[in-house]
Amino acid sequence: MHLEFDKGGLRFFFFTAAIRGRQPLLSRIVPRAPKRQRPGEVSPEPPRRRDSCAGWGVELAPAGEAVAKLWREVHARDPFLTASNFVLMPDHAHLLLLVDYRRAPAGFDLLGWRLRFRDEAAAAASAMLPGIKPSAFWEEKYWIMILNAGTSLPAVRRYIKLNPARKMWKESHPDLFARHTDLRHPVLDPALPWSAMGDLTLLGSPFLFPVVLTRKKPLEQHEPEIADILDRARNGAIPVCGFLSPGEKRVLELLRKEPGTRWIRTVAHGLPPRFDPSAEESRYLAAGRQLVLSSFPPDVPEFPVNWPNCHIMNDRNAVLCVRAAAGAQSKR
């Protein structure tokens, strides 16, 4: 494997490695215990380390403690490296590494360093696990992503932070994380290959309404429309939108902050067999507040964004909402 990237300045790298056979050797997912310590009170014994978010965290097993210890020592051993955010899930690890190429020795080999860290972590962890050899600890395959500090880095940090909660959300609400294909519903055009993930009951609302906020207008000019959309959503109506333009993204941001609001997020691509929603999106799927809906075949890719498909999606959203209103009228 060979990586091509600019080796100047600061660079972030996101590694994912899995335990051989996906055995749960590193940690277990636990509820986050509320802190009940009185002011000025000192706990006689520090609690076992928990990295937690949204009510769930990981409690490290001895093997996980060994890997975490090595990760935290990275900077002390190599000052041009910084071990940033990480989470050790039961059967895999997500690690975010910062490399300062201004201070790195000439010819620093990132992949060679990764192999050395992998082997050291395997040796330290397997020492806590009788019967498991270091060579059999990790899967051979791994995943690496070179991050853009301005865009992908914040998303990866959120992903790491929410990973324990995301796992529990999916296990607690398998119906809301199931991928539905060949979907049929009175509001959906039967000629299209609909697929979805989330709360399908949203399709049954008679109060679906399409949202399209053009990129051609600055965000502040959309404020009256955004206020109206939020008011309708607070009163039980369901916005149907791709949430792609700056104005639409602002609507989604505000909807998420409004308890009780629900929405349908349509996408201009297919939902592949292993469609995996983001950690942030998983929060709202688990709460039954969102439906992800596609009218495209599963092999239509998400990237690069297909703008003609976005316009097709908006047109189909409008038809969907008309059918919902017509169905409500016919039942009266």
Language-model features: locations:
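Glycine-biased, small-residue-rich flexible motifs in mid-sequence functional cores and linkers
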Residues: 179-332
